[in-house]
Amino acid sequence: MIVPNIMLLTSYGCTPCLRVKRILNELKAEMPDLCVQEVEFKSASGATLSLKNNVLYPPAVFLDGKILAKGKIDAEKMIVAIRESRGSS
């Protein structure tokens, strides 16, 4: 079984970011070995990620180093992609 690595590009006070974070936490409850890392949009690493991937504002979700979703994130599509990357649907 493959354990996906999730990175959430977020920002303080960002309501859509909180929604995506909640969804990822629920998914983590279902898949305890899921690795979720938060990166602050305004940090040096966040700025590098956003420039490299043309992310103009948070949130953005990366799956195994590749952008999965950004901006207005479709939760269902995100969940399906994470489950599929894990080898379960």
Model regions and ranges:
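Hydrophobic residues in alpha-helical membrane-spanning segments
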Residues: 17, 33, 59-60
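Secondary-structure boundary motif
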Residues: 29-33, 84-87
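Thiol-based oxidoreductase modules, predominantly thioredoxin-like and allied folds used
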Residues: 33-46
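Structural micro-motif
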Residues: 52-62
